[in-house]
Each structure stands twice: as C-alpha cells, then as structure tokens.
C-alpha cells in the first residue's frame, strides 16, 4: 500500500477553538471506507474503481468520468513535456534527461453535492506525476496534478525531433493571496481601518503553506521545461508570480465613500498591504530559487527572471497619489493610467474584451488584472509582421528569435499556470481571450495555455462544505493538535491548551518535512515577519 499524499484536517471546535489532525491517503484496491483522514469526497482512484465502493451509482459515474478525463489530459501533458525523442526512447532518455512520468495512481476530490463549491468546482481528479531529474541532488519529485490543456492536441511536443524548441518563449505563472480573509475583514471593522494590525501580523498558516506548496511545483515545471534545451536553441523562460496589492482596495472603498475612515487611515492601510506583498514576494522568490538550486538549474542562462505582477505598480502609485490629494480613486482614472504607461500591454488586452466583460468597478478591474497577467506573455509576442521587436522592452521580455527563424512567422509563446482549482474562472476567461488573440487578423501569435492545478493539503471541517483555507485560517490563533475525546475533556476542565498548540511551522513539518519548514521560517525572519 503506497501513500499518495499527506493532508491535514482543520476543525472548528464547539468551544470556539480550532483543532487540527493529520493523515494520509493511500492507494487501496478494495478497502471500502476505512478512511482515517475523514475528508468528505476525497478518494483514491483505486477505491473509486473498486467493486466494493460505497459511492452511489450517479456519484460513482461522476467520479469515473473525472478520472478518465484527467488521465487523458495528463497523458497529453506527459508527451508534450517529454518531447518526441523521449516518447520514442523512454528507457534511454530516462538515464540522462529530465522527464515527466505519469503514474497509475490518482486522487479525486469533490465537495458534497448541493454545496456552492461543488457547483463551482465539480469533481477534480489529480494524477500522480513523477518529475525525474537525473544527476541533480533532488532526483525525483512527486506531484498530484489536475491538467487542463484544451489548446494542446494529442501528439504535441515541447521539443521537436531535433531537440529544438517548438515555442518562442515559456512563462511559468503562479501566485497567492495575502494574509487571510478573516484578518483583512478584522482590519475594517465598523468602518475604521487598522493598518498597524496588518503591519504587525505574523505569517499566517495559509501564507506559509501556500509558499511551501507552490515553490516545489514551480521549480519542477521550470526545470523540466528548460533543462532539455541546449545553450544554442533554448527559448526564453520567465517565472511570473502574481501577488495582489491594490486589488484589496475593494475592502476599504465603502469606508472611504461613507467617510467613516480618514484618508490618512486609508493610505496607511494600503501601504501596509504593499509592504506585506513585498515581504511575501521576497520569501516566495527565495523559496523558488532554493528549489531550483536543488534541481541544479538555479543559475542556468535559460531562466531570464522571476517577475512580480508586471504593470501592477502603476495602479498602486495612482491610488496612493489620489488619496494623498484628498480624492477617491476612480475606475476611469486607473484605466487611463494603465493605457498611458509607456510600453504597456494593457491597451492590447483591453481591446480583446467584449463590452460585457469590461470592468464597471475597481473590484471588477481587480479580477480582470489576474486575467491580464495570464494573457500578457502572449501580448508580448503579438507583434505585427512588419514591425520589429521593441528594443525598449525589458531585457527579460525581449522576443527570442532563433537562428534561421523568420520574423514574420507567428510567434508561439507557451504559458503554464500553476494554481488552485478554485481560481479556474481566471484561466477559463484567459483561454477565451488567447483564442481571440490568435484569430486576430493583425497579430501573428499562436499562444498555448497549459493549466495545472494542485490539490489542497489542508481541508476545513472534513471538506463538508468544500471551504478553502484562505477563508477559514484561524491565524494568528494557533490550532490545537487533535487528541482523544478524553484528552479534549481533560484540557477543557484544566483550561490547558498550550501543551498541544501547533505553530504554523509545526504544520509545515508534518506536511512538507523539517527542512522545508525550517527554510521557510528562516526566509520569513529575513523578511521581518517572524
């Protein structure tokens, strides 16, 4: 029996505290429901296909369809990333080339029927994939991934038969939120803004767990996409980390409009948000560089840069300047600033939007900006045939034309996103816009979007409502390690909780190992957050 992945269950207790326990999901062929993790709707693929499954017929069919659908997509991804030669000679290429191996095992997750999460996310299957790195310190990394790649045709490859690149550029895109929803709400209570509370907030469980989970998969995918190229034929590889800042203005907009807070409070609050974003970006970048180093590609010339939310600064600055002048930011002013920035790609993005998709509020714009970050790498390549690439663009974003490549040929940027499945609305809209861009009569670009989603490692109340950690993280309150009912009663009588309180780093150690936990704690200290 093999363990597929480790998980945690965060529970709301009757006494108002939170408790947490840990478990693992194993590959079982016929064992019905002796599921120690007690997570509703979470099963191994072996259990779902077993004749002894207790799933209702309709539910069993839904799980089976999800499993089959993702297995097909994962197979396309495996062939795509490994290239023609690896597909033809897997035993030979395995010895000296990084490659991806799709395994039989998978896990399936679905919130209970009738919940909003089930309606929004459906049932997702995550296939076990082994990233193999011969010759590096970390020779193998295992990920459970849900794959969506509608623009990839079966047989498509990243490498051609001569190990050359099919794509002109590769962008690895991921991101995370700041704080938790609960903490942000607590700083806007009764219309008053508490920026100082944000400034002194220690790292949340959500933030630390998200960095641990993202950094490894970012490094895995980046390494695989660049390590098989030679020095003379590699495409530009960029990592883009999208962390929000001005997007949180929606939290305080009503306070400002109703005059329940001062503009000075609003400025202090937004500056605290920007500081947190800067700190988290620093930690996440260090975590990614560390993981890349473990795979021995941290300083390879193919990796151009790690960028943080390109073109977002202009909105931050406009909101701050507007508040300092004693005015409230307006949507039209922000759109004008985005369009008026030299070398901005926002005008091209905005022209792709239908009228019904254009923003009517700053809240709408915040969502669209996430979509913009996904589409932006393709816009960088969407150059009319008669025009040369702009020499004024940042060096890390310069188009990379290989020897013998004609400039009037369609550019083929590859965008690989790594995220939580709850965010798939962003990528669905981005995919539609990329299709519209590729069909444009005046742009020569043929982008490919590959969406990879990771399963959650921390579930809330046994996944009974499909809730996410970001919304229900109890931080800064520490959860209690779940004990027996007798221990819980004894603790309640003695008011003795401290002996079983778990720090966020304790939880990381259980899920990701001691080294990962210690490293992340150290990087947070360097950023001034521990």
UniProtKB/Swiss-Prot annotation:
Positions occupied by motif Conserved DDXXE motif: 419-423
Key words of the record: Ligase
Enzyme Commission designation: 6.3.2.-
Enzyme class name: ligase
Recorded metabolic or biological pathway in which this protein acts: Secondary metabolite biosynthesis
Catalyzed reaction equations: L-aspartyl-tRNA(Asp) + L-arginyl-tRNA(Arg) = cyclo(L-arginyl-L-aspartyl) + tRNA(Asp) + tRNA(Arg) + 2 H(+)
GO molecular function, one term: ligase activity
Role of this protein: Arginine-containing cyclodipeptide synthase; part of the cluster that mediates the biosynthesis of a highly modified cyclo-arginine-aspartate dipeptide (cRD). Within the pathway, pthA acts as the scaffold-generating enzyme and is responsible for formation of the cyclo-Arg-Asp diketopiperazine (cRW) from L-arginyl-tRNA(Arg) + L-aspartyl-tRNA(Asp). Additional enzymes from the cluster then further modify the cyclo-Arg-Asp diketopiperazine (cRW) scaffold.
Family: Belongs to the arginine-containing cyclodipeptide synthase family.
Domain comment quoted from the record: The conserved DDXXE motif is essential for catalytic activity.
Protein name: Arginine-containing cyclodipeptide synthase pthA
């Amino acid at each position: 029996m093999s363990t597929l992945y480790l998980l945690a269950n965060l529970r709301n207790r009757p006494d108002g505290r939170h408790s947490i326990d840990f478990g693992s999901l194993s590959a079982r062929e016929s064992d019905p429901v002796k599921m120690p993790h007690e997570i509703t709707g979470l099963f191994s693929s072996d259990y779902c296909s077993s004749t002894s499954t207790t799933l209702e017929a309709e539910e069993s069919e839904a799980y089976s369809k999800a499993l089959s659908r993702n297995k097909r997509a994962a197979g396309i991804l495996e062939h795509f990333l490994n290239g023609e030669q690896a597909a033809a000679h897997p035993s030979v290429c395995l010895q000296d080339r990084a490659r991806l191996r799709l395994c039989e095992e998978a896990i399936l997750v679905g919130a209970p029927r009738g919940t909003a999460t089930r309606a929004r996310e459906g049932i997702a299957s995550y296939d076990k994939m082994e990233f193999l790195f011969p010759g590096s310190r970390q020779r193998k990394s295992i990920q459970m991934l849900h794959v969506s790649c509608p623009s990839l045709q079966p047989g498509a490859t990243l490498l051609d038969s001569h190990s050359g690149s099919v794509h002109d550029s590769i962008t690895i895109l991921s991101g995370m939120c700041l704080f938790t929803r609960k903490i942000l709400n607590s700083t806007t209570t009764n219309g008053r803004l508490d920026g100082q509370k944000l400034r002194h907030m220690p790292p949340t469980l959500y933030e630390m767990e998200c960095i641990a989970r993202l950094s490894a998969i970012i490094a895995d995918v980046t390494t695989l996409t660049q390590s098989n190229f030679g020095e003379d034929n590699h495409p530009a590889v960029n990592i883009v980390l999208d962390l929000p800042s001005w997007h949180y203005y929606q939290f305080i907009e009503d306070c400002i409009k109703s005059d329940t807070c001062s503009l000075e409070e609003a400025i202090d609050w937004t500056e605290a948000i920007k500081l947190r974003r800067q700190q988290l970006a620093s930690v996440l970048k260090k975590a990614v560089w560390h993981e890349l180093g473990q795979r021995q590609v941290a300083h390879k010339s193919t990796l151009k840069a790690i960028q943080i939310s390109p073109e977002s600064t202009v909105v931050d600055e406009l909101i701050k300047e507007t508040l300092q002048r004693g005015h409230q930011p307006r949507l039209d002013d922000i759109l004008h600033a985005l369009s008026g920035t030299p070398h901005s790609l926002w005008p091209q993005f905005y022209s792709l939007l239908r009228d019904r998709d254009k923003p009517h509020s700053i809240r709408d714009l915040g969502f669209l900006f996430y979509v913009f970050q996904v589409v932006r790498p393709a816009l960088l390549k969407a150059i009319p045939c008669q025009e040369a690439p702009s020499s004024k663009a940042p060096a890390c974003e310069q188009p990379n034309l290989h020897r013998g490549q004609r400039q009037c040929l369609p550019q083929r940027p590859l965008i690989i996103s790594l995220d939580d499945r709850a965010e798939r609305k962003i990528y669905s809209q981005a995919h539609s816009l990329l299709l519209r861009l590729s069909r444009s009569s005046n742009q020569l670009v043929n982008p490919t979007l590959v969406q990879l989603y990771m399963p959650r490692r921390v579930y809330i109340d046994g996944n009974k409502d499909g809730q996410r950690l970001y919304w229900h993280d109890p931080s800064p309150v520490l959860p209690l390690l779940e004990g027996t009912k007798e221990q819980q009663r004894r603790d309640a009588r003695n008011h003795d909780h401290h002996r079983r309180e778990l720090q966020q780093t304790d939880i990381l150690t259980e899920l990701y190992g001691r080294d990962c936990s210690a490293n992340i704690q150290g990087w947070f200290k360097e950023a001034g957050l521990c």
